[in-house]
Amino acid sequence: MPVGGGAPVSVQSMTTTKTADSEATITQIYALAAAGADIVRCTCNEPAAAEGLARIVPRSPVPIIADIHFHHEMALAALEAGVHGLRLNPGNLRKEHEIKQVASEAKDRGVPIRIGVNAGSLHPDLYKRFGGATPEALVESARMELAYFEDVGFGDVKISVKASSVPLMIEAYRLASETFDHPLHLGVTEAGPPPGGLIKGTAGIATLLAEGIGDTIRYSLTADPVEEARAGRQLLEALGLRERKGLDLIACPSCGRAEIDVIAVAKAAQQALEERKLPIQVAVMGCVVNGPGEAREADLGIAAGRRRGHLFIKGTIVRVVPEDEMVDALVAEAERLVAEGIDARLAAADAGAAAEAEADRRDLLAGKGVDANASEERIELIRKKYGNHAEG
């Protein structure tokens, strides 16, 4: 997902699950992607979280950013896990040699880093020097971190200068846009619950975007992060910065429960749907156990089970079709959905579809087990190896 350089403004959000719980985290990532998130950030605060990232990254439908505080070793572990990017907080990760070590490793791996300055965790020296968390102090914090990166020849950088005060945030980003040539990640941090948090986030982010400042955004809400992703996407569409003209297809990368060749079905569905230029979100999921739930935010989806496909709209099963008709049925339903609307298609659902899906779900669990991907086995191994390395 390109950021800056003329690329469309992207939407970010952050998971609220424990990253070590990879199953819960990947479920939330799918929900965020379906709601409009282009990039998702996960905390990496302990070795178990890094182990979780190693399982999450290859299964994620969107790029994963590791959020790092205090411990540079966790940044290195996240890089080992294969993350697509890092966020470092210069307010609590302060040692020059550690920062340079992370930047050097990221450079070698071709992984970008966001310098994530936050008014609430500003370095005490800067707070004293500037008489508080001023726009100048926030920008200087980013500049100092950037200088460390430049010393090791690392330049694949994004910058954020967030604050919970909307006026402070706006002025800090205006100054940052005059100071840096790097992409800017916009956000009002700790904005609080909706509706107040939405109002504050929109006031800050929209003001800057309307001025041509900002390359990627995140609403920081005390709420289900799906609300963050949805708000971000809606804001960009309202400002004319993103327009859904065609298909937005998400698909699981398959797992031990998959009843179909997910890749083949996804490719066939994508080709057929793109030819029709339908402006909807469609999900192709490998099994009916978690598929409709993981992709419940998609307009339409299909999940496999017992040699047949289960069509769902916004997570609600509406029809069951033979396996060899899955793609055709998905395309036909997509055309009807665009023509008639979600409510009309939900009203036309087959009465027995949900019961058939539940029967298939139970059969799959009975046949392949609850832990088909051996996640519990992996978690137990992580506990044995890294249980004594808790964050301190």
Model-derived regions, located:
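Alpha/beta enzyme core
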Residues: 1-42, 46-66, 70-183, 201-211, ...
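Peripheral terminal and linker regions in Fe-S/redox and tRNA-modifying enzymes
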Residues: 172-392
